[in-house]
Regions:
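Feature for intrinsically disordered/low-complexity regulatory segments and propeptides
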Residues: 1-35
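Intrinsic disorder/low-complexity polar-acidic segments
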Residues: 30, 34-172
């Protein structure tokens, strides 16, 4: 027994998931689904995948967003991913990504390449922060549309082999 440590566990199997501090606030998996409904709008998200590792220490939920961008006629899909840990090893992370998350590898790729995310620790204010995230993500959706415009501009620029060699030489 530790005075300042507590265990999280799965109530369906009574399996401990991790040791946490007294200020740790649990974010239930159901809250991830509710977040999508609130942030995107009920019936707007197209649910893609949900998964977990181990006994449920880490979970993710992903949804395809309804509006794709087109770059020279090719659709670029956008996904919203909610990931959470239940063992004290991390917090809640919510991100936009063009990567369709279906497993641990694609989740890690999405996290490592995304600059469009919010992250929160499991403190008593985590639910307030998740609410603020909805506003932040609303702004991010606008930025994603702007990103599509920039992609189309870049896709129409002609680049020669010499341009590429010069660029690499100047930037390596």
């Amino acid at each position: 027994k530790c005075d300042n440590a507590f265990a999280t566990y799965r109530t369906d199997y009574n399996i401990p998931l991790g040791v946490v501090k007294s200020k740790y606030t649990i974010v239930q998996n159901n809250d991830a689904f509710n977040f999508f409904d609130d942030a995107i709008g009920k019936n707007s998200a197209i649910w893609q995948t949900a998964g977990f590792w181990g006994n449920g220490e880490r979970i993710f939920v992903s949804a395809k967003l309804p509006n794709n961008i087109l770059v020279k006629g090719d659709p670029v899909e956008n996904y919203l991913v909610f990931t959470n840990t239940h063992d004290g090893s991390g917090g809640v992370k919510i991100l936009f990504t063009p990567i369709r998350v279906i497993c641990k590898n694609t989740l890690n790729a999405a996290i490592s390449t995304s600059s469009n995310y919010v992250s929160f620790r499991h403190t008593t204010s985590v639910y307030n922060k998740i609410s603020v995230a909805q506003e932040i993500l609303g702004i991010s959706k606008i930025k994603y549309e702007e990103f599509g415009q920039y992609c189309n501009l870049l896709a129409n620029i002609k680049v020669t082999d010499e341009d590429v060699i010069q660029f690499i030489g100047e930037n390596l």
